[in-house]
UniProtKB/Swiss-Prot annotation:
Signal peptide, first to last residue: none
Listed NCBIfam families: PRK00150.1-3
Highest taxon, organism lineage: Bacteria
Provenance organism: Streptomyces avermitilis (strain ATCC 31267 / DSM 46492 / JCM 5070 / NBRC 14893 / NCIMB 12804 / NRRL 8165 / MA-4680)
Catalytic activity field: N-terminal N-formyl-L-methionyl-[peptide] + H2O = N-terminal L-methionyl-[peptide] + formate
Enzyme class label: hydrolase
InterPro entries reported in the protein's UniProt record: Peptide_deformylase, Peptide_deformylase_sf
Protein name (record): Peptide deformylase 3
Cofactor note text: Binds 1 Fe(2+) ion.
EC number: 3.5.1.88
Keywords: Hydrolase, Iron, Metal-binding, Protein biosynthesis
Cofactor: Fe(2+)
Encoding gene per record: def3
Length: 224
């Protein structure tokens, strides 16, 4: 049985308080922000479009806190709802520390730090790719998700500049995963649930570059 943390996490989500005040209180805790886990309603609500609610200075501090939290977790992406803030803001960064064979099969290449404000994506073409993925809000588990192999992402950056880019391979998976968070979706909503595996099982059995062996053993289909 897991013991409850004795760290007090401030309630930053009271609807009666201005968002800026709630974020200020959250940032006052210092260090990496607490990551909320599946079962928290904030992860199931569509996030509010960002329209200057935090102001430039507070936005910059919040973005830096997201970056710090993502690195500490560690992860390759983090959406604002995952720290209890229902705004359409996410950060991504992937140094791609994987063997060359794995990187080639999964299309995993290094991605610089990026801030995505009000992002949305659409599939480009019909190709789909299926790989195991995990989530900082669902710790300890991974599952296979089939996603569009190429997507067009539109968003703003932290300075309000337009972003309109196509992503392929693992970067496409990251931007889809984080944008889904902003729409109240978890990766498990799109996953092949027969593939659900603990991190221990992943390390022991399913560390291959593709999930083909897992599909055969666990009884689930992969896209053609």
């Amino acid at each position: 049985m897991a013991s409850e943390s004795d760290r007090t996490v401030p309630d930053t989500r009271s609807a009666s308080r201005p968002l800026a005040d709630r974020v200020e209180e959250l940032l006052a805790t210092g260090g990496p922000l607490p990551i909320v886990a599946a079962g928290d309603p904030v992860l199931r609500r569509g996030a509010e479009p960002y329209d200057g609610q935090l102001g430039p200075g507070l936005l910059a501090r919040f973005v830096e806190a997201l970056r710090l939290t993502m690195h500490a977790a560690p992860g390759v992406g983090l959406a604002a709802p995952q720290v209890g803030v229902g705004l359409r803001i996410a950060v991504i960064e992937d140094p791609a520390p994987v063997p060359e064979e794995v990187g080639a099969v999964r299309g995993r290449v290094p991605q610089p730090f990026r801030v995505l404000v009000n992002p949305s994506y659409e599939a480009v073409g019909s190709d789909r790719a299926a790989f195991f993925e995990g989530c900082l809000s669902v710790p300890g588990w991974q599952a296979v998700v089939a996603r569009p192999a190429r997507v067009r992402l539109t968003a703003l950056d932290e300075h309000g500049r337009a972003v309109d880019e196509e992503f392929t391979g693992w970067p496409a998976r990251i931007v889809q995963h984080e944008t889904d968070h902003l729409d109240g979706m978890l990766y498990l909503d799109r996953a092949e649930l027969r593939s659900l595996s603990s991190n221990e099982a992943m390390a022991l059995r399913w560390s291959q570059p593709t999930p083909e062996r897992a599909a055969a053993a666990l009884g689930f289909a992969l896209p053609d």
